[in-house]
Amino acid sequence: MNDRAAAFADSRQQHNRQDSAGMQEYVLQARGITKAFVQGGFNVQVLNNTELTVRRGEKLAVVGASGSGKSTLLHVLGGLDEPSAGEVSLLGKPFTQLAERERNELRNRALGFVYQFHHLLPEFTALDNVAMPLRIRRMTTEDAREQAQAMLERVGLGPRAKHRPGELSGGERQRVAIARALVTKPACVLADEPTGNLDGTTADTVFNLMLELSETLETSFVIVTHDPDLAARCDRIMRLRDGVLHEEPALPV
């Protein structure tokens, strides 16, 4: 009886360890997310009790019609907008329930953002744009620039570090934006149409870079895109329709 009890206890401990490991694999989780706005006196529901999970190193594409709420979803996932109901967890912490200061600290530590338009500071060099998130963390200028230079090398722009955004091509500016998003080594990057403002060849190059960095840095990506070919190259595709995310079947690349 004692042997059986010991075996049972050992089995339960192993099961609990597996559950704990499984929880740690999820860098981002959303449960029951609802978001509504009041427009013209009418209540407009954009997200309706939707769910999402993102594993470490996973590349998730979010597709859907224009105006379906994809950008709103990213804002809620990133803690930039409050959901009307539901909860977002980031690295196992209840992101949406944290005080503003704690939420900002966790966002700066664990999330990166890339947008359709690069939003680089025009008066700063590529190097100082990439170093900015590290300076916000109160890292010394020397250390921040050293890490920023290393990340610019990773995206193939080491020789362009001293150039300002106006001296770079569209694809180069977007690569600087990706370097800025990744320089803090975030667990997850939220990307809103990151190639939407680029021509086809440049978009493909930038997307390849994102996929490569996701693999080498074990960084998760949630990528909103209208391009079905790019979406098909992600690990999973979810379609936002009527405020709810639906898993799409895997497509051949």
UniProtKB/Swiss-Prot annotation:
User: What top-level class of enzyme does the UniProt entry assign?
Assistant: translocase
- Binding-site residues for ATP, renumbered to this chain: G64, A65, S66, G67, S68, G69, K70, S71
Membrane topology category = Peripheral membrane protein
Principal location? membrane
The GO annotation for biological process reads: lipoprotein localization to outer membrane; protein localization to outer membrane
Q: Where is the ABC transporter domain?
A: 28-253
Q: Which Pfam families match?
A: ABC_tran
Q: Which GO terms describe its cellular component?
A: plasma membrane
Tell me which positions the record assigns to the signal sequence: none
**Annotated localization:** Cell inner membrane
Source domain of life is: Bacteria
Enzyme nomenclature, EC number: 7.6.2.-
**Subunit description:** The complex is composed of two ATP-binding proteins (LolD) and two transmembrane proteins (LolC and LolE).
Question: NCBIfam families, per this entry?
Answer: LolD_lipo_ex
The protein's name in its UniProt record: Lipoprotein-releasing system ATP-binding protein LolD
Q: Which organism is it from?
A: Burkholderia orbicola (strain AU 1054)
